[in-house]
């Protein structure tokens, strides 16, 4: 009897994940056709979306990572524009969410809510509210609202890191947020993990230093072999570039094995190179280790936070070079079913 109950509980807790590898910037691509992606997301019927942001707690606990200074710069500006004491932020956010639930077209309150989320170091949901205001202004000019947004959020000053400027041509503005709004979702869940960013950067620097010496020395002895490997890498990125310049469905291609292999070669070269004499294999394996650790952390965050939210079907949106790593990790997790966007018909 206990075994039956335990098995039933495990079955009930199964999590389904729709994983989408994306570009972080679609601005230089041809006009993109997202119709199939939208259709598949709607068909999947998710109850939550996860994006590549740090949670409030992680943002406060991680002392440094690639866009920490940018986030602190935004925080400083928005506090100068209008500060809200930290203890008042939860109540302010709840109150504004109540207003917006009653009056979805109150874009002044949405601007206030974006501001409060940013002050609360919840960049994911600050961006979601800012995007809705920005998108409204693109369709319905409103000088008073535009002035209010500029005074409160200073979007023209937020230009680096995961900024408001970057948001406008990102995977969130083009894929996640339109579908979240259509499906009536009010929250973007954070899943990023930056606990190992310093280790990652140190291992990257170690590889670069030793690879430069390896390339200089090896070119004399194994020049043809090394040139052949570099040709393979360069040919891959020519293919990548060709897709980005010509395809109306870049996202679908980014979720293919071909794209994953090419993308990985940019960070990790080719596995065939690792056993070449004097190749910095130990340093490269360390670099790969820290990349896997970040992806493992992201997957763990999805699992734990989906469970806490009571979500059983979730969309996970991550940069293209995360997609295969995360899918492999999710596939090894008990009670998890994962498909990438191309596998969902």
What residue spans do the PLM features occupy?
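Bacterial Sec-dependent N-terminal signal peptides
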Residues: 1-16
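A cross-kingdom marker for long, charged
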Residues: 21, 237-345
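Proline-aspartate-enriched helix->loop->beta-strand connector
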Residues: 45-49
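N-terminal post-signal-peptidase region of extra-cytosolic proteins
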Residues: 30-37, 161
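Second-shell loop/turn segments in exported
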Residues: 23-27, 160-167, 286-290
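Extracytoplasmic/secreted cell-surface and envelope-processing proteins
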Residues: 27-30, 57-64, 198-201, 324-327
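Extended, H/D-rich, highly charged conserved domains that either
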Residues: 141-278
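Low-complexity, serine/threonine/proline-enriched polar segments
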Residues: 72-140, 222-272
């Amino acid at each position: 009897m206990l075994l039956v109950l335990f098995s039933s509980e495990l079955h009930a807790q199964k999590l389904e994940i729709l994983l989408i590898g994306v570009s972080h910037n679609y601005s230089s691509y041809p006009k993109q056709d997202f119709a199939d992606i939208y259709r598949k997301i709607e068909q999947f019927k998710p109850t939550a979306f996860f994006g590549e942001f740090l949670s409030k707690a992680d943002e406060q606990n991680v002392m440094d990572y690639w866009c920490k200074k940018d986030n602190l710069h935004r925080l400083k500006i928005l506090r100068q524009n209008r500060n809200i004491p930290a203890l008042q932020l939860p109540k302010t956010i709840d109150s504004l969410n109540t207003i917006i639930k009653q009056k979805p077209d109150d874009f002044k309150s949405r601007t206030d809510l974006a501001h409060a989320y940013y002050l609360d170091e919840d960049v994911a949901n600050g961006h979601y509210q800012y995007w809705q205001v920005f998108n409204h202004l693109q369709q319905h000019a409103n000088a008073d609202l535009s002035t209010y947004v500029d005074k409160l959020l200073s979007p023209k000053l937020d230009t680096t890191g995961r900024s408001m400027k970057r948001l406008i041509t990102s995977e969130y503005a083009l894929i996640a947020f339109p579908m979240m709004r259509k499906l009536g979702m009010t929250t973007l869940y954070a899943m990023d993990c930056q606990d190992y960013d310093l280790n990652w950067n140190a291992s990257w620097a170690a590889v670069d230093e030793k690879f430069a010496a390896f390339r200089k020395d090896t070119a004399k002895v194994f020049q043809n072999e090394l040139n052949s490997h570099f040709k393979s890498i360069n040919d891959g990125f020519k293919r990548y570039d060709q897709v980005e310049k010509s395809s109306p469905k870049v996202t679908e291609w980014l979720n293919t094995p071909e794209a994953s292999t090419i993308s990985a070669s940019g960070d990790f070269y080719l596995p065939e190179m690792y056993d070449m004499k004097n190749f910095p294999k130990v340093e490269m394996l360390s670099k790969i280790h820290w990349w896997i650790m970040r992806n493992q952390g992201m997957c763990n965050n999805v699992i734990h936070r989906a469970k806490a939210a009571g979500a059983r079907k979730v969309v996970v949106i991550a940069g293209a070079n995360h997609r295969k790593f995360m899918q492999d990790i999710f596939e090894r997790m008990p009670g998890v079913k994962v498909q990438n966007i191309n596998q969902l018909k």
